[in-house]
Amino acid sequence: MPRRYPEYTPERIKESKSYQVLLPKFNARRWAFGCSEWQDHGVDYSFEYVQDGFFHGFRLLGQVKGSSHLKFGNADSFSYALPVKTANYAVECSQPFVLFVVDLISATAYYLPLQDYFIANRDKYEKLKVNTSTISVRIPTRNTVSYADDDLVAVSYTHLTL
């Protein structure tokens, strides 16, 4: 019987392409990042904001998804089918958890801070209790990852409680 090995599936190729698009968009002088040791639990990357050359614990946990079929219903946002298990994990995290959705056609990376999203959309949060596989979230098209990253920096500060 021949040995079996993990397969490099089209889904894994899409995942690799999404990392290739997303990671160079971060300013490496302001963000340290690495593949997460929690990858099998929903976190693909951890990003830490570097302020004036020092680490202060301002972190983001990130789930990265790639798609060649994003549907922009209007110019302000688009809908994304988020796995409910990812949403539940995100809202329970003690650090800011960001969904990164990469448009593999335009090479644009969008982001959605999931805890903030479900706080602002309480009806969506309540739907997480229903036993479904996905929930539709709306991602603003203005939420793009780029060197002009002040909005993402602000998200990294949201865990502060002092």
Where are these predicted regions, by residue range?
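Interdomain/boundary linker segments immediately adjacent to catalytic/signaling cores
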Residues: 1-11
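Intrinsically disordered, low-complexity coil segments
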Residues: 4, 27-28, 124-128
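Catalytic centers of nucleases
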Residues: 15-76
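Aromatic/His-enriched, Gly/Pro-containing loop or helix-boundary segments
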Residues: 70-88
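Mixed-charge intrinsically disordered linker/loop segments at interdomain junctions
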Residues: 84-157
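Conserved small/polar residues in nucleotide/adenosyl-binding loops
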Residues: 158-162
